[in-house]
Regions:
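Long, contiguous internal "core" modules enriched in hydrophobic/ aromatic residues
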Residues: 53, 58-207
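Membrane helical hairpin/interfacial module
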Residues: 1-51, 55
Length: 208
């Protein structure tokens, strides 16, 4: 297993566990959480909860095998299952939001694309950050350099396509675009998403 893969495998259950804890308040009381798991195909929320649970289980087992240096014949099978579940996790939030027909701005498959690309980009960013903090450089993960550049570029194109598509889709979605670009959410959009999420990572990767 390569160094980059080892870091990714070991970091995945930790980050996913933190994300799962942040989602619990959205479900409300404990009874709602239990109900969600007891009805796995009742809604997209239930499917997402099961995806998170399965991913945590598989990722934790893989990380434990790597840390304990245990050779297991089913390791490749666990990798395959983990990859399938990971794809589901990347798509889940975008699919959930895009399925809400009552919100014109979200009702587009481009939202799924944007979430998937953003997830992949965050994964590359995590590996690079770990390399920089532990080695003072990301040269050990040089294979990810151009992958990171490509993902940032695709993310930017997808974001522009999403905004243009929503701008011409309806008056309501156009108002949502205006709120993001020029209104009350403009600071979060331009500083948080565009600058910190796309421009800064792209510059850091290019000048490393």
């Amino acid at each position: 297993v390569s160094r980059a893969s080892r870091v990714g495998f070991c970091g995945a259950p930790v980050l996913l566990g933190i994300a799962a804890l942040m989602l619990f308040p959205d479900l409300g009381n404990p009874a709602a959480i239990v109900f969600t798991f007891l009805n796995p195909v009742r809604s997209l929320v239930s499917i997402g909860a099961w995806l998170i649970a399965l991913a945590l289980a598989v990722f934790t087992i893989v990380a434990a095998l790597l840390l304990l240096r245990v050779r297991c014949r089913c390791f490749r099978l666990l990798e395959f299952i983990g990859s399938i579940v990971a794809v589901g996790l990347m798509c889940y939030t975008g699919v959930l939001l895009a399925s809400m027909n009552s919100v014109d701005f979200w009702n587009t498959p481009l939202l799924v694309v944007l979430f998937v690309i953003s997830a992949l980009s965050c994964g590359c960013g995590f590996l690079s950050a770990v390399a920089f903090c532990t080695q003072g450089s990301t040269r050990g993960f040089s294979c990810l350099r151009w992958v990171g550049v490509a993902l940032c570029a695709i993310e930017a194109v997808s974001l522009v396509a999403l905004l243009v598509g929503r701008w011409v889709y309806s008056e309501v979605s156009r108002q949502s675009c205006s709120m993001l670009l020029f209104g009350e959410w403009a600071d979060v959009f331009w500083v948080g998403l565009v600058l910190c999420g796309i421009v800064v990572p792209l510059v850091l990767v290019c000048f490393e």
